[in-house]
Design a protein with these regions (language model features):
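Structured beta-strand-rich core segments of catalytic domains in phosphoester-bond hydrolases
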Residues: 1, 24-28, 36-117
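Generic enzyme active-site microenvironment
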Residues: 5, 39, 164
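Catalytic domains that recognize anionic headgroups
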Residues: 6, 11-13, 37, 67, ...
Length: 193
């Protein structure tokens, strides 16, 4: 059983990277890795490649109303699904329940708050470095609030779960520590973390 998580950045819809081959490259990687469940953050319906290996999918929000869409593709039938609308944010979470080896399993796809750092943001050369630090502090608070919202959903879940996330933070952060309580980090366990 394999799971893949990937922030596809709208499949380069707005040409942030000067290459028209980005969607095809993403599609090729997905086909080569061939995960059983695929969680995508910053999804774009209009730019997404056809992923014929997956008979089941859940995309949220259903209408792109100021939220960054998430998609979960599955080779297993989806028994249940849900959406976690992070308050005062363009980010959110979603989940699906599937049956694997005759057991119900939940897969979460979370996209936590981004720092939205740009070229002008520098603690060293920016005269407004104090404002930048306040921006960081606000993002840290939002991420922890989003994890609290996720934990409230997970608290009433009776099934084993897998959490895929674009954490928008490091493994040394409070967000990582809060999200990893009583969980195993597959990246670390694989010996690459």
């Amino acid at each position: 059983f394999s799971v893949m998580s990937y922030n596809v950045r709208l499949f380069n819809k707005y040409s942030w990277i000067d290459s028209s081959s980005i969607p095809a490259s993403i599609e090729d990687l997905i086909r080569v890795k061939n995960p059983d469940v695929l969680c995508l953050q910053e999804y774009s319906r209009s730019e997404a490649p056809r992923l014929d290996a997956y008979d089941y999918k859940y995309i949220q929000p259903s209408r792109e109303m100021g939220k960054s869409p998430l998609a979960i593709y599955s080779k297993f039938p989806i028994l249940d699904q849900g959406y976690i609308d992070f308050e005062a944010s363009t980010n959110s979470g979603a989940f699906i329940d599937i049956s694997f080896r005759n057991k119900r399993l939940r897969v979460y796809n979370l996209h936590l708050e981004s720092f939205r750092i740009n070229a002008e943001d520098s603690l060293f050369s920016n005269p407004n470095s104090e404002a930048l630090q306040l921006k960081f502090d606000e993002v840290f608070r939002k991420q922890l609030t989003q994890i609290d919202q996720f934990n409230a959903v997970e608290a009433v879940n009776d099934f084993p779960s897998i959490v895929c996330t674009d954490l928008n933070n490091t493994q040394f952060s409070k967000a990582y520590k809060a999200l990893s309580v009583d969980r195993n980090d597959a990246f670390t366990l694989a010996g690459k973390g």
